[in-house]
Amino acid sequence: MAETLSGLGDASAAGAAAVSSAASETGTRRLSDLRVIDLRAELKKRNLDSSGNKSVLMERLKKAIEDEGGNPDEIEVTSECNKKMPKRPSKGRKPEDEGVEDNGLEENSGDGQEDVETSLENLQDMDMMDISVLDEADIDNGSVADCVEEEEEATLPEGLADSTELVEGDLKGLPEQLQEHAIDDKDTVNNVDTSSSDFTMLQEMEEASLEPENEKILDILGETCKSEPVKEEGSELEQPFAQATSSVGPDRKLAEEEDLFESCGHPEEEEEEEEEDQEEEQEEEGDLALASSSKSESPSTRCQWSEADAPLAVVKREPADAPGGGTGMDREPVGLEEPVEQSSTAAQLPEATSQELVRAPTAALSPEPQDSKEDVKKFAFDACNDVPAPPKESSASEGADQKMSSVEEDSDTKRLSREEKGRSSCGRNFWVSGLSSTTRATDLKNLFSRYGKVVGAKVVTNARSPGARCYGFVTMSTAEEATKCISHLHKTELHGKMISVEKAKSEPTGKRVPDRRDGDSKKEKASTSDRSANLKREEKGERKDDAKKTDDGSTEKSKDADDQKPGPSERSRTTKSGSRGTERTVVMDKSKGVPVISVKTSGSKERASKSQDRKSASREKRSVVSFDKVKESRKSRDSESRRERERSEREQRLQAQWEREERERLEIARERLAFHRHRLERERMERERLERERMHVEQERRREQERIHREREELRRQQELRYEQERRPAVRRPYEVDGRRDDAYWPEAKRAALDDRYHSDFSRQDRFHDFDHRDRGRYPNHSVDRREGSRSMMGDREGQHYPERHGGPERHGRDSRDGWGYGSNKRLSEGRGLPPPPRRDWGEHGRRLEDDRAWQGTADGGMMERDHKRWQGGERSMSGHSGPGHMMNRGGMSGRGSFAPGGASRGHVIPRGGMQAGFGGQSRGSRPSDARFTRRY
């Protein structure tokens, strides 16, 4: 307890500032004082989600506590592991693992006792690959040395569960009295055994289906921590089979030979046979005591193979120094081999050994011991050359039989004692849960050493889940001491925490470090088991060395046969590295005098065979098959390979022919497709050509239709024009000749005279091009004629009134007749007796022409009708003015009668002037008014 208290003091000194109370005490704390790890532990205890930051966790926990009816300000928190654990980084544990271990160590800390039991159940179910060794105690006394090595071997890769039977063979191989000679290889042996035991436990936790096998293994591995030396597997397995097969007889051996040959490729059947052989071997344990007479020879053998093995089994440690270390130093450690070669089949070796040993007596009893066994050895590599050769073969050395039988008997006695110990070791291991974070492996060792010898103590945790609890795994020297510890220390207090001690369920001693990956663990598992197998094989080789100095001839012969085997190349290479005279041995049973077993003891060959997988077991059984069967199998194999070759060639030919035909078919199909493609292309081009022609014809037809349409439109337009032109004269009002003739003021003579004068020799066609000459005959311009007539009459009158200006009426009439030549004045003067019009000068005549031209420009369209109306109106108005005042009015109207009085006569000037302005412009006002009109009115 002093150590415990000191450890606790160190821990509290290092971490008191961080933790409010001792790490293992239960206290009431406020919710706000809890760390994230405490919050997560409380949430996990309530099966709530523990992810998120601190505020989320506090809110979640507070809600949960309020739902439970508790007070969030007073929470009972049990700290299980202190963050400030002053522990050294132990083997297999990195410094950063401490933090990982601390996280969550306070979870499940509600009520300690239930948590302890629950954690124990969880621990039994924990995946062994996840267990990390936090601390382990170094136990230095002699009987415990191997357990120290076993615990330090925790850093070795896991996975010797499959090779536990091999380890069993090693443990059973030598008698207990050799312990004093075997101290030198204790480290090696214990490394192999403890690792295998640990890995067995690991395998058990991972695969529940392997539990029966693991329980068997537990018996084997029980002695790991009792410093039981490794015993020879071959010898241990040989004796019971020797007795069994010697009593059976040759017939059964031949049947077993055939069974072996049939089961060449069936490793599963071989495993079953191996289990049956082990049961048989256990039944015959009682008879094995007979062999104890030859124990004296075994120590030297033990020493020599163990020394050869020392460099093999220790992976991370140097071999321990031991008192008997010098005994076998003159021997060469032929067991050394790369782990790759050893890695896969070590677990097969016990099965292989047992089954091969069952069949071996047949070869030993055969009438031609040497040749047949060499052939058997050849068969082991020829008949099944697809798998590595067996590590054991029969030998024809009769001289070595006596010596080897004693070794065999020794190994059987050792196996018996070791099995008893293994059965007693089932209950030596127990778990300790509920540990404080300050508890170290030395504390556990000191605590449990009160009730017995502590073989191993470790503090482990689940490395895969951060913040997992810490557990202790303790191995006592005997099951009784373990039971005593459990009864005395279960539900007791350690470092302020209630610990629970419970027996490990069918688990061998020690936990594993899960730091390595599964692949590495499997590889290393196989390699460690291979090393233990190497120890056994080398021991046999060395024993053969001593026993068989005279057997060189047969040995050379067998080695030649070995060299021409079809096994792997490294097998023959390693075979030569061993001693050349120790290839095979025939072991004789002295009590019965019959050859019991044939052992192939070339260490290098054994090593090479270990590089294969489980199938190597079947090869060991095949070592007793006769040479005839070898030849037979070779012939059948050759014929089968020949048949296979012919079949493959035939298939290739058929395939080639089929491919050729397929190519031809494809070519024909391609040509047909190309032809179709060309035909379709031609048809498409023809269709396109026809389409183009059709489009062209369509365009032509459309153009023709448009042309016809245009012509039709043109014709229609012309017809409409003609119709319009024909219709236009009917719309215009023609000149009413009769109506004008009826007019009192415009007699017929005047109209005719005007008409004749208009159409006289004075040609006006060239002057007025805007007139339509066709229509002139229809409605002549009477306005012009009228104006002309009026002017002529006015001129006549002016000539009468102003003879001094005009020169008399005669001269004026003559001039007007000569100058104008219209004949109208003559007719007028003839018809009415009017005097001839006054003579006009050419200036006035030019003015009149100008006026006429201007009037003609405005006379188109309906103007003529309006002019006719106005002329008629004017004439009528003029005709209405009778009386003498009219002369003056007209004179004044023409602009010349300035002497006429204004007065009422002005009203008559306005229409006349307006009429003149409408037709002639302003120049008309200067024309002289004809004075002759006065006589008419």
Curated annotation (Swiss-Prot):
Modified residues (Phosphothreonine): 188
Matching InterPro entries: Nucleotide-bd_a/b_plait_sf (IPR012677), RBD_domain_sf (IPR035979), RRM_dom (IPR000504), SAF_Modulators (IPR051738), SAFB1_2_RBD (IPR034781), SAP_dom (IPR003034), SAP_dom_sf (IPR036361)
Gene Ontology BP term (one): regulation of growth
In-chain residues carrying the UniProt-annotated modification N6-acetyllysine: 629
Chain residue ranges for the region called Interaction with SAFB2: 621-937
PROSITE patterns per record: RRM (PS50102), SAP (PS50800)
Location of cross-link Glycyl lysine isopeptide (Lys-Gly) (interchain with G-Cter in SUMO1): 600
Compartments it resides in: Nucleus
Modified residues (Omega-N-methylarginine): 832
N-acetylalanine carried by residues: 2
Coiled-coil ranges per UniProt: 652-726
Region span, Interaction with POLR2A: 550-814
Biased composition (Acidic residues): 67-77, 98-117, 268-287
Composition skew (Low complexity), residue ranges: 11-24
Cited Pfam families: RRM_1, SAP
SUPFAM superfamilies: RNA-binding domain, RBD, SAP domain
PANTHER family, per the entry: SCAFFOLD ATTACHMENT FACTOR B-RELATED (PTHR15683), SCAFFOLD ATTACHMENT FACTOR B1 (PTHR15683:SF6)
Subunit structure: Monomer and homodimer. Forms heterodimers with SAFB2. Interacts with KHDRBS3. Interacts with CLK2. Interacts with POLR2A, ASF/SRSF1, SRp30c/SRFS9 and TRA2B/SFRS10. Interacts with SRPK1 and inhibits its activity. Interacts with RBMX. Interacts with FUS. Interacts with ZBED4.
Function per UniProt: Binds to scaffold/matrix attachment region (S/MAR) DNA and forms a molecular assembly point to allow the formation of a 'transcriptosomal' complex (consisting of SR proteins and RNA polymerase II) coupling transcription and RNA processing. Functions as an estrogen receptor corepressor and can also bind to the HSP27 promoter and decrease its transcription. Thereby acts as a negative regulator of cell proliferation. When associated with RBMX, binds to and stimulates transcription from the SREBF1 promoter.
Name this polypeptide is given: Scaffold attachment factor B1
